[in-house]
Amino acid sequence: MVIRFDQIGSLVLSMKSLASLSFQRCLRENSSLVAALDRLDAAVDELSALSFDALTTPERDRARRDRDHHPWSRSRSQLSPRMAHGAVHQCQWPKAVWAVIDNP
């Protein structure tokens, strides 16, 4: 590929536009992730207010089975090391919820 000198300016602008679009996409994904985590926190707060003593043994067994196959378990392995050791890693509520289900 041969680039003439008079095309360099438009090439640089194209590269800047591409970088800007990529950055905007990352921001959009980040805000979506933060919003999803906020909804998850709200759901956990609601779940924490409930009494797990009301669960029957079959319901507890189902919860344990679902826990082992839950997407959250798989999604943690997909996190970048920075995220895995950052705020997402500090979220201990899954352990607390499953501990209550496992030990009524």
UniProtKB/Swiss-Prot annotation:
Superkingdom, according to UniProt?
Bacteria
Organism lineage reads as: Bacteria, Bacillati, Actinomycetota, Actinomycetes, Mycobacteriales
In its UniProt entry, the species of origin is given as Mycobacterium tuberculosis (strain CDC 1551 / Oshkosh)
Expression induction per the record is: A member of the dormancy regulon. Induced in response to reduced oxygen tension (hypoxia) and low levels of nitric oxide (NO).
Where are the stretches annotated Disordered?
Answer: 58-84
Q: This protein is called what?
A: Uncharacterized protein MT3211
Per the record, where are the segments of Basic and acidic residues compositional bias? 58-71
